[in-house]
């Protein structure tokens, strides 16, 4: 049972006639009703119409005719929805949030981005921080600058785990072991403080609640699941919004307010819930919540890149809602893994989901694709054909026969607006991750023969990376860890498991040597990574299958790609594999993101 006399910091007392809330219930900004052009503007809610309580003449005639006068009178007097509507009037939100949430009408400029330093101004030194990262797009939202700070007590929380794993067994047991070793090998961070959860599926929520301390801050990028997590906690532990003054004093709620938490918890939650939206940067100020006997702070999301593309610009708003609304994710893809087949062509045949990206396999390759991105997929003869079709869709106002496949706006109408990336050569499967969009699994089939590099074309400003298939990687690593009684690492140390891609010129024909050249330019001062610069990369990739001693020993994907110095100085790297990596010249995400 909650200690009701404990901190309800900031829930204002109110009556049905006077609204005294001072913050938007959705974005937590201070409300004002004087200047519509300034942030926080809202219109005062109107009272319920008298007609709700006093039926008009036509209503009375109908009631007389149906002989339900007495029943209708009782229904009006005891209508539980009437009280709900009155109470929801008290959940005041600003005009900006009202237009965005209820009418899907918003200007992205009214949702400004914040930097990490901006957000950390809200967090006192030495505070407990939960770094929220969506596991489904790991590692693109993982910020080592947060995890490495000495002035914060940071725990890594991986949300949306139900979009990666079939059940919570792996989430509760296997992920923490894997992440402990991943952080140690990759970031030199020795930490046991990792949780994988699913707020929608209620996976590990009780464990998470028992772990987090009083006065904890939730920190992460926009739309990573902070507000959804808070709402799950509020429902499970009967939590509510609070306000803390400058002295740290907690203002207790009125008995009337708290009584409703027990008499009508559903309505109580509607009033107290955090604002959840597919729109990024909705939260503009810190909002505190009382969850059981603990205070939890929801911080605004922050962005790590000033050149990041706002997805509202190129992507159709209906498609964007499907991408961002976690509850619409179809988990049957996790269980069934239904794939689509595609063969590479000499014309540059491509695979796309809405025009958001174009995947171009090399000529003659046979590929299987498992899509974890909402929306129908389509193949085209080449990228130019795809762009031409989608341009026609945008100009036809929805009458084009292929309009259902178009997920981009008319602003993306030329091939030059896409960046071309080369994917390192691989045997088996990889997952291609697009930040804030999702991921696809790409698998090559048949006998290995190097036919060229896979390519992916993406609108400029969208981050992309590849990884070994995450579920299989963690499952096999855990099995190895258990069988050896912890002597073998759950996270591979003989190879990086995530990689960045290389941008190519649109007209570049020799992509493999272009990758090598680019790598050498970026590692000019890294002598250990340039020991085999004179070897021909084509000779290597043509005979990968013959080098079984150096490739097939690598479990799962066997990425035959990466050529950077070992992740850590004590990594036990097979010399043949190490030599192969250095010859091919592929740069890793670890080097690009994690190393300063």
From Swiss-Prot:
Principal place of residence: mitochondrion
Compartments it resides in: Mitochondrion
Function in brief: Interacts genetically with prohibitins and thus may be involved in the mitochondrial lipid metabolism.
Organism, as annotated: Saccharomyces cerevisiae (strain AWRI796)
UniProt keyword Transit peptide, yes or no: yes
Family stated for the protein in its record: Belongs to the TRAFAC class YlqF/YawG GTPase family. GEP3 subfamily.
PANTHER family given in the database record: GENETIC INTERACTOR OF PROHIBITINS 3, MITOCHONDRIAL (PTHR46434:SF1)
Any GO CC annotation of this UniProt entry: mitochondrion
Top-level taxon in the UniProt lineage: Eukaryota
The organelle targeting sequence, given as a residue range: 1-21
Keywords, in A-Z order: Mitochondrion, Transit peptide
One of the record's GO molecular function terms: GTP binding
Protein name: Genetic interactor of prohibitins 3, mitochondrial
Domain CP-type G, chain residue ranges per copy: 113-305
SUPFAM superfamilies noted in UniProt: P-loop containing nucleoside triphosphate hydrolases
């Amino acid at each position: 049972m909650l200690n009701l006399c404990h901190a309800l910091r900031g829930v204002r007392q109110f009556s049905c006639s006077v609204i005294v809330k001072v913050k938007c219930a959705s974005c937590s900004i201070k409300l004002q009703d004087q200047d519509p052009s300034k942030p926080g503007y809202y219109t005062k809610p109107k009272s319920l119409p008298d007609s709700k309580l006093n039926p008009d003449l036509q209503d009375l005639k109908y009631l007389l005719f149906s002989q339900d006068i007495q029943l209708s009178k009782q229904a009006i007097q005891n209508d539980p929805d009437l009280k709900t509507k009155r109470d929801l009037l008290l959940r005041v939100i600003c005009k900006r949030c009202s237009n965005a949430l209820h009418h899907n009408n918003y200007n992205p400029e009214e949702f400004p981005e914040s930097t990490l330093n901006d957000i950390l101004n809200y967090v006192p030194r030495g505070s407990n921080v939960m770094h929220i990262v969506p596991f489904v797009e790991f590692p693109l939202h993982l910020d080592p600058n947060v995890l490495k700070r000495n002035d914060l007590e940071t725990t890594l929380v991986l949300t949306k785990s139900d979009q990666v794993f079939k059940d919570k067994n792996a989430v509760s047991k296997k992920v923490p072991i894997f992440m402990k070793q991943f952080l140690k090998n990759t970031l030199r961070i020795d930490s046991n403080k990792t949780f994988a959860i699913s707020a929608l599926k209620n996976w590990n929520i009780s464990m998470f609640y028992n772990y987090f301390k009083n006065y904890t801050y939730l920190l992460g990028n926009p739309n990573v699941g902070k507000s959804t997590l808070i709402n799950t906690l509020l429902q499970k532990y009967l939590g509510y919004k609070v306000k803390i003054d400058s002295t740290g004093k907690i203002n207790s709620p009125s008995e009337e307010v708290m009584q409703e938490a027990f008499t009508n918890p559903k309505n109580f939650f509607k009033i107290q819930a955090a604002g959840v939206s597919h729109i990024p940067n909705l939260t503009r100020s810190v909002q505190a919540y009382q969850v059981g006997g603990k205070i939890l702070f929801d911080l605004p999301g922050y962005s790590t890149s000033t050149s990041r593309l706002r997805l509202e610009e190129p992507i159709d708003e209906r498609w964007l809602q499907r991408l961002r609304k976690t509850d619409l994710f179809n988990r049957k893809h996790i269980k069934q893994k239904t794939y689509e087949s595609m063969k590479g062509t000499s014309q540059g045949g491509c695979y796309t989901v809405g025009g958001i990206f174009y995947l171009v396999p090399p000529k003659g390759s046979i590929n299987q694709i498992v899509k974890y991105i909402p929306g129908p997929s389509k193949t085209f003869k080449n990228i130019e054909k795809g762009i031409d079709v989608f341009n026609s869709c945008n100009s036809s106002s929805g009458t084009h026969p292929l309009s259902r496949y178009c997920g981009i706006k008319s602003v993306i109408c030329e091939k030059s607006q896409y960046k071309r990336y080369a994917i390192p050569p691989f045997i088996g499967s990889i997952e291609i991750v697009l930040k804030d969009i999702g991921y696809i699994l790409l698998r090559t089939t048949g006998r290995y023969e190097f036919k060229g590099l896979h390519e992916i074309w993406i609108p400029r400003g969208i981050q992309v990376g590849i990884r070994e298939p995450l579920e299989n990687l963690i499952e096999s690593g855990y099995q190895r860890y258990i069988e050896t009684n912890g002597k073998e690492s759950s996270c591979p140390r003989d190879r990086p498991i995530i990689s960045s891609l290389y941008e190519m010129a649109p007209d570049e024909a020799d992509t493999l040597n272009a990758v090598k050249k680019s790598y050498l330019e970026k590692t000019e001062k890294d002598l250990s990574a340039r020991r085999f610069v004179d070897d021909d990369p084509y000779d290597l990739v043509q005979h990968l299958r013959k080098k079984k001693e150096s490739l097939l020993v690598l479990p799962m994907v066997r990425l035959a790609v990466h050529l950077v110095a070992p992740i850590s100085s004590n990594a036990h790297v097979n010399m043949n594999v190490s030599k192969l990596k250095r010859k091919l010249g592929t740069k890793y995400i670890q080097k690009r993101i994690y190393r300063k």
